[in-house]
Amino acid sequence: RFCHGTKSMSDENLYRYLDANKQIKLDPEGYLVKQGDWDEGVADLLAKDEELTLTEEHWELIRVVRDFYARYEMAPAMRPLVKATKQALGEEKGRSVYLMSLFPGSPPKRLARIAGLPKPTNCL
């Protein structure tokens, strides 16, 4: 029989923890469960989890996506990310090639994850 209010064990097994103290919970795709858990130290741990070492260039882009999120309440997909980067950091850095060089694969997804934001809505 079905019991209301009980949590299935499999639901909990979908999550993992970023830190040894089990304070920072990640969803199955590696995004923070609680955005309030984010700080620069957490960003470093998330980057390490992605096998990245954050440089000042990475931090510039993290600030761009966090600012974008603060304004629009959503993480940017690639085209809005390129545009926001161009506006904030100039023509040279506002190019998808530059973003790919720092966040290979899917810059919007990797940046949102490391910046402690939800997954961009149109990223698979």
Label every PLM stretch briefly.
Residues 14-15:
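Extreme N-terminal leader/activation tails
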Residues 66-73, 91, 100:
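Amphipathic alpha-helical interaction elements
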